[in-house]
Regions:
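Catalytic phosphate/metal-binding cores of nucleic-acid and nucleotide-processing enzymes, i.e., regions
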Residues: 1-89
Length: 89
């Protein structure tokens, strides 16, 4: 619910009909969690929420061509930022 609400606030009524590449930037408060544990769960929930909110039609192979992950430390403002790059039109 929190992810869907954040998407609705940030992306308003955006609807993407082409395939996309998603860049994830994870800002963690410390180095306690394994990188794959951070990214794996986040990909699932964020991509499902993008579909639920109507930003993406689906989150299958034909809709998301790939993604990349970057990890940073930010003790005071942990967050996840995503950039959605729409591929050819």
């Amino acid at each position: 619910m929190l992810i869907s609400n954040a998407i609705r606030l940030q992306l308003k009524r955006l609807h993407i009909h082409n395939s996309v590449f998603i860049k994830y930037s994870f800002y963690e408060p410390n180095r306690k969690r394994d990188l794959d544990n951070i990214a794996g769960v986040a990909h699932k929930f964020i991509q499902d929420s993008l579909v639920k909110c109507g930003v993406l039609e689906n989150d299958g192979w034909g809709n998301i061509t790939g993604f990349s992950d970057q990890f940073f430390l930010d003790r005071y403002n942990p967050r996840i930022e995503i950039v959605i790059q729409e591929e050819g039109e």
